[in-house]
Amino acid sequence: MRSSLTMVGTLWAFLSLVTAVTSSTSYFLPYWLFGSQMGKPVSFSTFRRCNYPVRGEGHSLIMVEECGRYASFNAIPSLAWQMCTVVTGAGCALLLLVALAAVLGCCMEELISRMMGRCMGAAQFVGGLLISSGCALYPLGWNSPEIMQTCGNVSNQFQLGTCRLGWAYYCAGGGAAAAMLICTWLSCFAGRNPKPVILVESIMRNTNSYAMELDHCLKP
């Protein structure tokens, strides 16, 4: 089975898959921010949370120890986190699409040319830039009341208070940086140049097809 990728292209496809899966998995896991509330550990992502308070019997607050997403988009604690959810999600989707095409290029001949590989690298740069923008927007939501309750009521924008950043935040940012810097550069050498013989055969095949259609139309 011939590949449409060079040896560098095969490495590019592998790294593209790794960065896409790393960033996307980190996006969905609620381990971007760690804190505590009512003596229980609490963690957040942009649209998910683990352990949250609810009103129990007698209107007392109790902690529900489970993970889940917010009930609606508007329930996300801050506008900055809402924007982060959309921007980061779009970037992850773009990286996954490019990674899928790159993996298919390892198995299919003539799928990815030199120019196509560079265009896919540009798409990876945009995807990584979107995820990086989401990571940059994330600290803008640390001044919301829900986050302040978890971070000792002393957190603010770009100030964690008693909270700390989680490993998923770093993985998302690291995956985005690798996609922008490494994968984009490798994509310039990923695709094979089309062979002249293949180009001639393709042109002749199309020409013959058009000639047959024209001849069929001209016949009475």
Curated annotation (Swiss-Prot):
Query: Which residue positions does the secretion signal occupy?
Result: 1-20
Keyword terms: Glycoprotein, Membrane, Signal, Transmembrane, Transmembrane helix
Please describe the organ and tissue distribution of this protein's expression.
Widely expressed. Expressed at high levels in lung, thymus, skeletal muscle, colon and ovary.
What GO cellular-component annotations does this UniProt entry give? Answer: membrane
User: What parts of the sequence cross the membrane?
Assistant: 86-106, 122-142, 165-185
Disulfide cross-links: none
Name the domain of life this protein comes from: Eukaryota
The record's subcellular location field reads: Membrane
Which positions are glycosylated? N153
Does the keyword tRNA processing belong to this entry?
no
What does the record say about its membrane topology?
Answer: Multi-pass membrane protein
What the record says about family reads:
Belongs to the LHFP family.
Q: What is this protein called?
A: LHFPL tetraspan subfamily member 1 protein
Annotated gene: LHFPL1
